[in-house]
């Protein structure tokens, strides 16, 4: 009897996370989109050289773009290519998804936040959150709930000993 090899690689497929977005916004919906990348960017992403903490998604002429995302070029990158680490990158989505996002932004006053960057097979994908901004008191409430959950877990763990 022959064992089948697992197709899943060891380790995580996540390249970068935007924890700040979950703190700053109420995430209503999550959408997956592809990205238009250059060769040196893909090589840098394989090394994990990405930061999406300050990134945001905007719509222009019916297309979606991500701005503020930094992909640091590798030292051994090609010399004939000028690498711009913070360039605006186009997102690849279907027309129906783009129209849906545009409608939600215009009608409901929502915003688009980049949540995570990850590998899906050999393609780089970005997870976009359709979000609404939090007020300061909402952020405080979330922190209190998180602290209370930690305290409950600590008490339960000590009571089971």
Swiss-Prot record:
Location(s), subcellular: Cytoplasm
Any one GO biological process: trans-translation
A family per Pfam: SmpB
PROSITE patterns membership: SSRP (PS01317)
InterPro entries reported for this sequence: SmpB (IPR023620), SsrA-bd_prot (IPR000037), SsrA-bd_prot_CS (IPR020081)
Presence of keyword Transcription regulation: no
Gene Ontology MF annotations: RNA binding
A Gene Ontology cellular-component term: cytosol
Keywords: Cytoplasm, RNA-binding
Similarity comment: Belongs to the SmpB family.
Biological role: Required for rescue of stalled ribosomes mediated by trans-translation. Binds to transfer-messenger RNA (tmRNA), required for stable association of tmRNA with ribosomes. tmRNA and SmpB together mimic tRNA shape, replacing the anticodon stem-loop with SmpB. tmRNA is encoded by the ssrA gene; the 2 termini fold to resemble tRNA(Ala) and it encodes a 'tag peptide', a short internal open reading frame. During trans-translation Ala-aminoacylated tmRNA acts like a tRNA, entering the A-site of stalled ribosomes, displacing the stalled mRNA.
Name of this chain's protein: SsrA-binding protein
Gene of this entry: smpB
């Amino acid at each position: 009897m022959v064992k089948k090899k697992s197709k899943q690689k060891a380790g995580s497929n996540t390249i970068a996370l935007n924890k700040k977005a979950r703190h700053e916004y109420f995430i209503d919906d999550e959408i997956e989109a592809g990205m238009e990348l250059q060769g040196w960017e893909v090589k840098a992403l394989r090394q994990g050289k990405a930061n999406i903490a300050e990134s945001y998604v905007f719509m222009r002429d019916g297309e979606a773009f991500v701005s503020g995302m930094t992909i640091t070029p590798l030292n051994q990158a090609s010399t004939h290519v000028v690498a711009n680490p913070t360039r605006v990158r186009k997102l690849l989505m279907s027309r129906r998804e783009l129209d849906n996002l545009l409608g939600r932004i215009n009608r409901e006053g929502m915003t688009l936040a980049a949540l995570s960057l990850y590998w899906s097979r050999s393609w780089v994908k970005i997870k976009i959150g359709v979000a609404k901004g939090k007020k300061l008191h909402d952020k405080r409430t979330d922190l209190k709930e998180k602290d209370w959950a930690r305290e409950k877990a600590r008490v339960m763990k000590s009571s089971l000993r």
